[in-house]
Regions:
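Short beta-strand segments of immunoglobulin-like
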Residues: 19-23
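C-terminal, structured domain-capping segment
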Residues: 24-56, 125-181
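N-terminal edge beta-strand
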Residues: 9, 14-17
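Low-complexity, polar-biased intrinsically disordered regions enriched in Pro/Ser/Thr/Gly
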Residues: 16-17, 66, 148-150
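A surface/secretory-pathway sequence property marking extracellular, secreted
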Residues: 7-10, 56-121
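Short, isolated positions within intrinsically disordered regulatory regions of eukaryotic proteins
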Residues: 18, 111, 125-129
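Conserved small/polar residues in nucleotide/adenosyl-binding loops
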Residues: 1-5
Length: 181
């Protein structure tokens, strides 16, 4: 429950994780749940917008080939396999998002921009949020890209930056959806 006098961004599941659980490695999925809260003590509902900035880098990546059939053979009738890594882009470095996420229902993508260093998304929640209420998380987890070991220096920070903007619905009376604001 929100109890302050403003909008706030929380990540309840992420905040519960010990630091060692937040360490990423290729293919790892970790809980991360940016949630917007209308913490205003007034009676005004607010439209909530989340901006998410994902780091990008020019690296080599790989895909796990899932070719195994139920009988243990693969589609090429070679030795049984449980999946093998196949280099993407012919093994050449290419610019990729270092993490990915799947937005939850109720959030609409308003804008998306990419540079060599970042991929930025702006999402709006589908309706105004009453004081003391919160949105469901924009997403529940993030997955680190399958980056070839050594392509990023060990200890490279993979910061996912989330920013919240709230607009009181009383000041945009003509708006019926967050996209109208």
């Amino acid at each position: 429950m929100c109890i302050r006098d403003r909008a706030e961004l929380t990540e309840p599941e992420w905040d519960k994780l010990p630091d060692e659980a937040k360490v990423l490695y290729p293919g790892k999925t970790v809980a991360k749940d940016p949630t917007a809260c209308n913490a205003a003590e007034s009676t005004t509902a607010a439209y909530m917008y989340l901006q998410v900035e994902i780091p990008r880098a020019s690296v080599r990546t790989y895909t796990i080939a899932e070719t195994a059939k139920a009988d243990g053979s693969d589609e090429t009738n070679q030795e049984p396999t449980s999946g093998a890594g196949v280099l993407d882009n012919g093994g050449e470095p290419h610019t990729v998002d270092l993490v990915s996420f799947q937005p939850n229902d109720g959030w609409s993508l308003l804008e998306e921009t990419e540079t060599e260093e970042t991929h930025t998304f702006i999402y709006a929640y589908e309706s105004a949020i009453a004081p003391g209420a919160q949105t469901p998380p924009l997403f529940d987890c993030v997955t680190y890209a399958n980056v070839v070991e050594g392509d990023l220096p060990q200890g490279t920070a993979v910061d996912i930056i989330c920013r919240l903007t709230a607009i009181q619905s009383d000041y945009v009376a003509d708006a019926n959806t967050p996209q109208d604001v």
